[in-house]
Design a protein with these regions (language model features):
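Short beta-strand elements that form the blades of beta-propeller/WD-repeat-like
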Residues: 228-242, 287-298
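Short, Lys/Arg- and Gly-enriched loop/turn segments at beta-strand edges
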Residues: 65-71, 146-157
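Core beta-strand residues in small-molecule sensory/regulatory alpha/beta domains
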Residues: 38-40, 106-109, 113-121, 141, ...
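Hydrophilic extracytoplasmic domains
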Residues: 265-336
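Positively charged n-region of N-terminal signal peptides that target proteins for export
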Residues: 1-5
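SH3/SH3-like (including bacterial SH3b) beta-barrel domains
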Residues: 25-26, 40-63, 120-143, 149
Length: 336
């Protein structure tokens, strides 16, 4: 009797040990595919035991070649291709990116043209986790460039050096990327050509072949029974890889008498960098006026601030003490 009891105890301990080994957690992973099937075995013929969705947390309990056996939060276990999973480091990186840009100012709203992945850094081959649906609305925060099919970000030391690199036929092809925030507050990098900057139609028609990068409402004017916004717009040439985020600034004000937008101010030849600050400031007898501050690079590649004020319909530079303008501001009333 004692012998049988001992054998039974040893058998139970052995089975328990095997069970723990079979179901031990190797690591935590997250599903990067829009949706993936869990299969009961790694074979050409299998049964579906469950489904996991994008961003879902799973525990890896076993691996076999290109497959991983995972356990979901509900306890379902099954095999999934490892290419549909990303590790904890990638998840933590996206969480940090979101936290670091939680309060980053919005430069423009955008709409996704296609299903798009949120990457942890600019580049088509960089790690990504979340996938956004076509038509999703996002907030554009920043811009960067990356080499096509490369993971490294192109960060030119000086604008002049970058321009020479772009002109060189042997130079790498660059793509523009936007740092965006989605409706759920998640932040990541997306290929800029996948995003349409959601510019109001009333001013989009004045693009003149240039690309809108960002726009801001400076203030509103009363026209009859409605208020009409007046805009600051940042534009650039319609190609990727520029060493600056924008090179043109335009201000569109509303002509109350003619009921139309007019170009109150434009400036070219800038090497502007996002973000742009829009605020209000008191100017004594002029009252409280809309103010915008641009960050631009000088000839040495240093980033400096340039402040402007709008006293409708005139835009003027606001010079810092001792500052001398390189060239006078040129207010315009010509319709574009």
């Amino acid at each position: 009797m004692k012998l049988w009891s001992c054998l039974l105890a040893i058998g139970l301990l052995t089975l328990g040990g095997c069970g723990r080994s079979r179901h031990r957690v190797l690591e935590v992973a997250y599903v990067s595919a829009p949706q993936a099937t869990l299969r009961d075995q790694v074979a050409a013929i299998y049964n579906r035991v469950g489904t996991v969705k994008n961003g879902e947390r799973v525990e890896i309990v076993d691996r076999e070649k290109r497959f991983a056996r995972v356990r979901t939060a509900t306890g379902i276990e099954g095999w999934i291709e490892q290419r549909y999973l990303v590790d904890q480091k990638t998840f933590d990186g996206l969480q940090k990116l979101t936290q670091d840009n939680q309060n980053a100012p919005v430069q423009a709203p955008g709409i996704l043209r296609n299903e798009t992945n949120l990457h942890i850094t600019p580049g088509r081959e960089t790690e990504h986790l979340y996938q956004l649906a076509s038509g999703s609305k996002v907030s554009i925060l920043k811009r960067a460039t990356a080499e096509k099919q490369a993971t490294s970000v192109k960060l030119p030391a000086k604008p002049t050096e970058a321009k020479e690199s772009l002109r060189a036929s042997s130079g790498p092809a660059l793509e523009d990327w936007f740092l965006v925030r989605d409706a759920e507050g998640r932040v990541g990098w997306v290929l800029s050509r996948m995003v349409d900057v959601d510019v109001p139609l009333d001013i989009a028609q004045y693009a003149e072949g240039q690309r809108f990068v960002a726009f801001f409402v400076l203030d509103e004017v009363q026209d009859g029974d409605k208020k009409v916004p007046q805009y600051l717009c940042l534009l650039t040439e319609p190609h990727d890889g520029s060493p600056y985020d924008y090179d043109q600034v335009r201000v569109f004000t509303w002509n109350v008498r003619k009921h139309r937008y007019e170009t109150a101010y434009r400036e070219h030849g800038l090497e502007g960098v996002l973000p742009v600050t829009v605020t209000q400031e008191s100017f004594g007898k002029e009252g409280t006026l809309p103010v915008f501050i641009l960050q631009v690079k000088d000839n040495s590649g240093n980033t400096i601030d340039r402040k402007y004020k709008l006293n409708t319909p005139i835009v003027r530079r606001v010079l810092a003490p001792g500052e001398v303008p390189a060239r006078p501001a040129r207010p315009l009333r010509k319709r574009r």
